[in-house]
């Protein structure tokens, strides 16, 4: 019988919903219970900002300037933590391009792979995942800022 591995999860928040958006926060939960989260200082040419997206993630641009870390620092830290691993996301169609944008701006190659969470979970498990994630996010938002 094959053992069940704990997946590594990554989530990215961005400045907006379209092609001009860029990552503003990245969070990961590793299979050994290590967690990492960082706000990202926007690069000088990253000027797109969507107020509707801000209402969703509740991160104001001035917060990024105050508490964020430089693009290169965040990308390098992700590479150190995730080298050779596969990370999973429930928002692959947006998280993967945002990570690509981060690493392109940092002038680094990603040392890890990004895969859709749907590749390892059944439809029923995905439903439970979304319900659980929504509950956790509600709790975290109560205490985050």
Residue ranges and their predicted role:
Residues 2-97, 101, 137:
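Conserved non-catalytic scaffold segment of RNase H-like nuclease domains
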Residues 59-62, 128-145:
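A polyampholytic, Gly/Pro-enriched intrinsically disordered region
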Residues 87, 104-108, 126:
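Alpha-helix capping at helix-to-loop junctions
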Residues 111-135:
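Short, flexible loop segments at boundaries between secondary-structure elements
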Residues 95-114:
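Substrate-recognition/cap helix-loop segment adjacent to the acidic, metal-dependent catalytic center
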